[in-house]
Swiss-Prot record:
This is CTP synthase. PANTHER family: CTP SYNTHASE, CTP SYNTHASE-RELATED. The keyword Metal-binding applies. Residues 1-265 are annotated as: Amidoligase domain. CTP binds at S13, D146, I147, E148, K186, T187, K188, P189, T190, Q191, K222. Keywords: ATP-binding, Glutamine amidotransferase, Ligase, Magnesium, Metal-binding, Nucleotide-binding, Pyrimidine biosynthesis. Coiled coil: none annotated. L-glutamine binds at Y54, G351, L379, G380, M381, Q382, E402, R469.
Length: 550
């Protein structure tokens, strides 16, 4: 019988519901339970695929090609269960489903209303996301009291009534602010948040209180008294320097034990060996490197969430402290390469649109000419190909048709069709809406025997996740290979170039796919592990040269 844990938030947004849910999921998984998570987002967009990175942050792509909330990235980094499109639902998608059913006559002429039709669809989607797991953590986006969240809160209230206390648990996150001028913690916002939740008909079983300092026992008792939550279930969630410490912090307060007891789950003790190993790798580095990330959305770090975490994972698995410097590619265009000179390695991530592209090309040239390790991802591979074509293959006006429609040498162009692993053909054109023109999800890639890519992966066939519209133009393949660009990876049918590298460079690898989506703190990822090692080696070479010169 599947158990459901509903996670809500109050007082303010961005309290860390996703991280808390994922951390509790990790603890329950460590007890031997099959755990999955579902995110319910209250916005009306069908998915975040066409939303601005500045508003929404990263779009996390699942293996089945769904464009989802970045919290699903946290879920996959903390639990072993792979997420899919059934793990993220928005208000827009819920209403789209209901309206489609109404058009088909599924409601037999009844008036379609929020209750019961929308709430029933929400409950159906939650159960669909359960995917035979023993425990499902359901995170409700937004803040209690927001009008947008009301249908979701009503749906989980109904599930609590229908399934009963032995099958459901409600966990509420709140903020306990510290007023520095008074030197006091204030619990009143938490009391009012719980009051608001109870007015909807939901009594929380667990309170997770976000704060800067540990919660004094006197304040814990006060909160328990005014919210009717057991004192031991008032959890203190203190700020930590790494999100990967949170499972151990919650374990120390016996959150998993509280949950297991209420839900009547029979499990063994939590085995946290893997998480202890992660923390050991974080806290006892042997090296230190600075990675310069050259991007378009650097003012909003959430746009590169999986990428920054993947770099940290590489540091954990190579025992290297990773410092990430974010550099706006437009700044390179305006001020030159000064911001690159302290980099032990350079990374250019994905992105869309012409803005800042020339700055990225300058950064690629700097890395190639100065032997600085370079990793290009998605757009980062495309600008690497453009730079190589311009400066190594004599095509001075080479470009992508995304940025220069009439370039004489379109080394990157919109692909109109490709063959899937099942043999089917997928097609698209420039007239399709933005939501339907992407190559999304898992695709197989064949690696060139003897290439750096094959060596670092340790195999010649891999599966990685994609999110792009433009691709390497095969009309230029022979010419660029002749100039020294290695086509290190291709789609399984050989038609699409998925990876390129430069063999005579210390470490220059670029890929069309997004390896950051499959990197985890416990397992790392071969590309990022190798990239961090290369950065550390480059740092040692530069340090040795400087000492000799002095």
């Amino acid at each position: 019988m599947t158990k459901f844990i509903f996670v809500t938030g109050g007082v303010v947004s961005s309290l860390g519901k996703g991280i808390t849910s994922a951390s509790l999921g990790a603890l329950l998984e460590a007890r031997g339970l099959a755990v999955t998570l579902v995110k319910l987002d209250p916005y009306i967009n069908v998915d975040p695929g066409t939303m601005s990175p500045y508003q929404h942050g990263e779009v996390f792509v699942t293996g089945d090609g769904a464009e989802t909330d970045l919290d699903l990235g946290h879920y996959e980094r903390f639990v072993r269960m792979t997420m899919s499109r059934r793990n993220n639902y928005t208000t827009g998608r819920i209403y789209e489903n209901v309206i489609a059913q109404e058009r088909r006559g599924a409601y037999l002429g009844n008036t379609v209303q929020v209750i019961p039709h929308i709430t029933d669809e929400i409950k159906r989607c939650i159960c669909a996301g359960a995917d035979n797991a023993q425990v499902v953590l359901v995170e409700i986006g937004g803040t209690v009291g927001d009008i947008e969240s009301l249908p979701f809160l009503e749906a989980i209230r109904q599930m609590g009534v229908e399934l009963g206390r032995e099958q459901t648990l409600f966990m509420h996150l709140t903020l306990i602010p510290f007023i520095r001028s008074a030197g006091e913690l204030k619990t009143k916002p938490t009391q009012h948040s719980v009051k608001e939740l109870r007015s909807i008909g939901i009594q929380p079983d667990v309170l997770v209180c976000r704060l800067e300092h540990p919660l004094p026992e006197s304040e814990r008792r006060k909160i328990a008294l005014f919210t009717s939550v057991p004192e031991r279930a008032v959890i203190s969630a203190v700020d930590v320097d790494s999100i990967y410490k949170i499972p151990l912090e919650l374990y120390a307060q016996k959150l998993d034990e509280i949950v297991v007891e209420q839900l009547g789950l029979e499990t063994g003790p939590a085995n946290l060996t893997e998480w202890q190993r992660v923390i050991d790798g974080l806290e006892h580095p042997h090296d230190e490197v600075t990675i310069t990330l050259v991007g378009k959305y650097v003012d909003h770090r959430e746009a590169y969430k999986s990428l920054s975490e993947a770099l940290i994972h590489g540091g954990i698995h190579t025992r290297t402290r990773v410092n990430i410097t974010y550099l706006d590619s437009e700044e390179i265009e305006a001020q030159g390469i000064g911001g690159l000179e302290s980099a032990d390695a350079i990374l250019i991530p994905g992105g869309f649109g012409e803005r800042g592209v020339e700055g990225m090309i300058i950064a690629v040239q700097y890395a190639r000419e100065n032997g600085v390790p370079y990793l290009g991802i998605c757009l980062g591979m495309q600008v690497a190909v453009i730079e190589f074509a311009r400066h190594q293959a004599g095509m001075k006006e080479a470009h992508s048709t995304e940025f220069s429609e009439h370039t004489p040498d379109p080394v990157i162009a919109l692909i109109t069709e490709w063959r899937r692993a099942d043999g089917s053909i997928e097609r698209r054109d420039e007239q399709m809406g933005l939501g339907g023109t992407m190559r999304l999800g898992n695709y197989e890639c064949e690696l060139l025997p003897g290439s750096r890519a094959a060596a670092l992966y340790g195999q010649e066939r891999i599966t990685e996740r994609h999110r792009h519209r433009y691709e390497f133009n095969n009309d230029y393949r022979e010419l660029l290979e002749g100039a020294g660009l290695v086509m290190a990876g291709t789609s399984f049918d050989g038609n699409l170039v998925e990876m390129v590298e430069i063999s005579h460079h210390p470490w220059f690898v670029a890929c069309q796919f997004h390896p950051e989506f499959t990197s985890t703190p416990r397992d790392g990822h071969p590309l990022f592990n190798s990239f961090i090692r290369a950065a550390a080696e480059h740092r040692r070479r530069v340090t040795l040269k400087s000492s000799r010169d002095s």
